[in-house]
Swiss-Prot record:
<keyword id="KW-0997">Cell inner membrane</keyword>
<keyword id="KW-0812">Transmembrane</keyword>
<dbReference type="Pfam" id="PF02673">
    <property type="entry name" value="BacA"/>
</dbReference>
<dbReference type="InterPro" id="IPR003824">
    <property type="entry name" value="UppP"/>
</dbReference>
<keyword id="KW-0133">Cell shape</keyword>
<feature type="transmembrane region" description="Helical">
    <location>
        <begin position="11"/>
        <end position="31"/>
    </location>
</feature>
<keyword id="KW-1133">Transmembrane helix</keyword>
<feature type="transmembrane region" description="Helical">
    <location>
        <begin position="199"/>
        <end position="219"/>
    </location>
</feature>
<dbReference type="GO" id="GO:0005886">
    <property type="term" value="C:plasma membrane"/>
</dbReference>
<dbReference type="GO" id="GO:0009252">
    <property type="term" value="P:peptidoglycan biosynthetic process"/>
</dbReference>
<keyword id="KW-0378">Hydrolase</keyword>
<feature type="transmembrane region" description="Helical">
    <location>
        <begin position="159"/>
        <end position="179"/>
    </location>
</feature>
<feature type="transmembrane region" description="Helical">
    <location>
        <begin position="94"/>
        <end position="114"/>
    </location>
</feature>
<keyword id="KW-0573">Peptidoglycan synthesis</keyword>
<keyword id="KW-0961">Cell wall biogenesis/degradation</keyword>
<dbReference type="GO" id="GO:0071555">
    <property type="term" value="P:cell wall organization"/>
</dbReference>
<feature type="transmembrane region" description="Helical">
    <location>
        <begin position="265"/>
        <end position="285"/>
    </location>
</feature>
Amino acid sequence: MLIAVSSADRLDLWQAIVLGFVQGATEFLPISSTAHLKVVPVVLGWGDPGVAFTAVIQLGSIVAVLSYFRQDLTYVLRGLVSAVRRQDFRSEPAQMGLGILFGTIPILIGGLLIKRFIPDYDNSPLRSLAAIAIVSIVMGLLLGIAEQLSKHQRDLSQLRLADGLWMGFAQALALIPGVSRSGSTLTAGLFQGLKRDTAARFSFLLGIPAITIAGLVELKDLLEAGIDGSSLGVLAIGTLSSLIFSWLAIAWLLRFLRTHNTWSFVVYRIIFGGVILTAIATGTLQNI
């Protein structure tokens, strides 16, 4: 049972489950799911699964975050509706809602520009292992700086539209493989003085529109290109695996950040990037 994910690579059922786990376990941690979905299969000799497969199984992560934050989303939506009726957007849920809406615009524009002007982005040098490793180290250092400088004082009740815009521009950087959408938005939130778990919580909510749209677009492209039933089944299994482990990762990270700082992720990202660069330099790993 195989699924075509690019012109050269195919995944079997077990590989789809493993990559679903990798996607789910890393999507909401500030370590880049895209980087791990590129590195893990290459290290295991499976090849690069490609942008399309990565984007589609992210839909499992979206179902997880919608389920986990259903009360938050209801609160925000009701607040937005009430704000529209009253023409007063100063309330907490209205500010959160506007932050999510306007914070989504930068990554949508960036994604459209890439799709329009870089049709072969799947094979871009930015997706090479060396580029991903360097980006991982740089983003790890930025997270460390944010952790050190942040006041960690502001919670969701103090969230404003400006925070959503700032984190939205940071989210757009995640179009570069290895940046980490969760990592870039968490870093931006910390620079804004948000508490760690507050920055993470809003980061998850902010990511819902962008990840959903990206996943649906890639799924549509796959269906239009022609994909058989067995391949859809394997893709579904990978997405289900992503859903389960995404939910677990969200729950764990929010608990972790209430009582811990982000230095463990900083160290991990630097080591992750360093190991990849060393492996490439020594010829242990091919820079694909």
